Curated annotation (Swiss-Prot):
Its main location: secreted. Expressed by the venom gland. Disulfide bonds join 5-17, 9-19. It comes from the Eukaryota. This is U1-poneritoxin-Ae1f. GO terms for cellular component: extracellular region. GO terms for molecular function: toxin activity. It is found in: Secreted. Belongs to the poneritoxin-Ae1 family.
Amino acid sequence: SFYACTNGCWVKPGGGCQC
């Protein structure tokens, strides 16, 4: 499933957000 990060961050391949 798709996970959207907030504040313009993007989802890292391993999970979590990169800002």
